[in-house]
């Protein structure tokens, strides 16, 4: 095999592997808080402020991410800060076409774990 062809194949393989590790994921947060409470979420990813969202009871909001997604969340007097997407931690755990589905409840944040086919508590609210 000539050198140019070998190099071209190597470059193509490297780029395809790099592209697959930078896949986009969707982080979805669903509000399942008691008393029809609103959930306020302010997120940042890769140094970008993604703004503040108010998620009403039994509704959700999604972000498309490939890097760490860190969010401040609050409802009533309860506040917390959570990494709701970390590619090293979550890439293999998320389901449904690269979607990390979070359900926010009174006791904390639950993630649907694809391998276990169920929601599992990942983060408790501070003070719980």
Residue ranges and their predicted role:
Residues 2-63, 72-128:
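Intrinsically disordered, low-complexity segments enriched in small/polar residues
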Residues 67-69:
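Exposed beta-strand face motif in extracellular beta-rich ectodomains
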């Amino acid at each position: 095999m000539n050198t140019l062809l070998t190099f071209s194949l190597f470059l193509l393989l490297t780029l395809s592997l790099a592209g697959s590790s930078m896949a986009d994921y969707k982080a979805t947060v669903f509000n399942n808080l008691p008393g029809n409470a609103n959930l306020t979420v302010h997120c940042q990813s890769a140094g970008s402020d993604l703004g503040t969202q108010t998620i009403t009871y039994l509704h959700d909001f999604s972000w498309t991410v490939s890097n760490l997604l860190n969010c401040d969340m609050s409802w009533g007097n309860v506040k917390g800060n959570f990494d709701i997407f970390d590619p090293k931690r979550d890439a293999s755990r998320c389901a449904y076409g690269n979607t990390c589905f979070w359900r926010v409840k009174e006791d904390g944040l639950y993630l649907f774990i694809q391998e276990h086919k169920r929601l599992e508590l990942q983060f408790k609210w501070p003070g719980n």
